[in-house]
Amino acid sequence: DLLTMRNVLTFLLLLFSLLCNGQSPKLFTTDKELSSSLINQIYQDRNGFIWIATEDGLNRYDGAKFTIYKHEPNNEHSLAHNFVRTVFEDSKGHLLIGTYIGIQMYDPATDNFTPLAKLEDTGETLESNINSFIERKNGEIWVSGNVLCKLDIKDHLLTVRKVDIAVTSPGSLFEDKKQNVWMAKGEEGVYQLTPDNQLTLHLSKDNGYVKSICEDQRGNIYVGSIRKGLFIYDKERKTFVPIDLKEKGELPVCFLYSGIPNELYIGTDGKGVVIYNIRTHEISEYKFDNNYFDSGNSKIHSILKDNSGNLWLAVYQKGVILIPARTNSFKYIGHKSTDKNCIGSCCITSFCKDNNGTLWVGTDNDGIYALTEKLEPAKHFSHTTHPHSVPSTVIKLYEDSEHNMWIGSFINGMGKLNKQTGLCD
């Protein structure tokens, strides 16, 4: 059907976009793509869309462009609130949105959002700052916010009923392979709810602010603390014990990601991304090419490895870094690259490599760029008021047998370029 075909085309666009970028990291910012650099989560749905939840809108990337969703006061089908903390898709394909004031569901058929979820017993809207969703092994969807709730979805109507448990305002939720539900409770620690409903509090207030929980492929449970670093659950002693990160000390852990075999990716609050090797217990800093900011001092609030193996990092107050996994012969140069941004942001219209190995690049509305053999910036000739200035739009570049560089413009005819001055004869 039409929706299936659209999903296939979206996947192909996303795949082609990522393949063309080689291994060069790509930075998405508020300059052109994102609604906000205050990013809470990166999530991929079953159709391949990348969703970015921010403090000022919800962003969706289809492999070619971003679509931004925001609250529209006179549109009841719009996003209920611009502060979006989390996105989650259940096993039936329902895409749930957790906002500052409640829960909505996105309808891809209409590109709209449902009304906010209501309380089952009173019919009133659940007004809650939503933190997390999980789908339990028994099919129940649990939601954490000001209260802990179970969510029911029927005919695009969302209803919730409160879970009778002595935990108020739980943060991140996680269910392990043995059906224990773990609840991060910030300063208070982390709660464990067993399958027989026994509730246990782990980690005292002295162990910092617990924010993230995950489980590795071996069934080990980890929690991350903003002030006290990384902990692992000791199953025999039934308690969490700190992991010695040696020279890294007590990392301010914001986010834990265990989707990569034998490695735990740790997003920190001011120390970038750190990798903990589960087998060797060694720690290392994750490094990538980046000319825009010091990645070792960045705040990483979310990490995602997508279906193609590409790594996405939410860098708080900076944007989103995409690090492609695939290697190919193409190297990206342009304004979206974190490595080489030396040809502006306008469309490229022509190329010419001269006898000295210099690559000349003609653009639409930004003149001519010259790059060295190592693709480093050499010169930029833009249009000025000088009567012999290069044109702003260059359609064609050509070097003749005497090494003269000729320019074909859009509406200003043809000219011979002086490679030193940038003027045309």
What are these language model-derived features?
Residues 1-425:
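Carboxylate-rich, polar loop motifs that coordinate divalent cations or form catalytic acidic clusters
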